[in-house]
């Protein structure tokens, strides 16, 4: 348990940061799910639009360290491959 005032403050800040980071991670997952559901719908235009909205969010969270940069790259690559497969 935190004893010093500094340690208590850091504990409070960590709780706040954890909640904020969880919210941001949830947002990334939501954008990915929206893109996947658009792909499942089979409409190339809708899937492309969803992908274009998801990519900047994924990149921003990777830059902030919310998700690892390799994980962001993996998601973008797989989503892009699925969207391109709809074009054929």
UniProtKB/Swiss-Prot annotation:
Biased composition (Basic residues): 7-21
GO BP field: translation
GO molecular function, one term: small ribosomal subunit rRNA binding
Alphabetical keyword list: Ribonucleoprotein, Ribosomal protein, RNA-binding, rRNA-binding
Classification via InterPro entries: Ribosomal_bS20 (IPR002583), Ribosomal_bS20_sf (IPR036510)
GO CC annotation terms, alphabetical: cytosol; small ribosomal subunit
Region span, Disordered: 1-21
Family: Belongs to the bacterial ribosomal protein bS20 family.
This protein's name: Small ribosomal subunit protein bS20
Lineage, highest ranks first: Bacteria, Pseudomonadati, Pseudomonadota, Gammaproteobacteria, Moraxellales
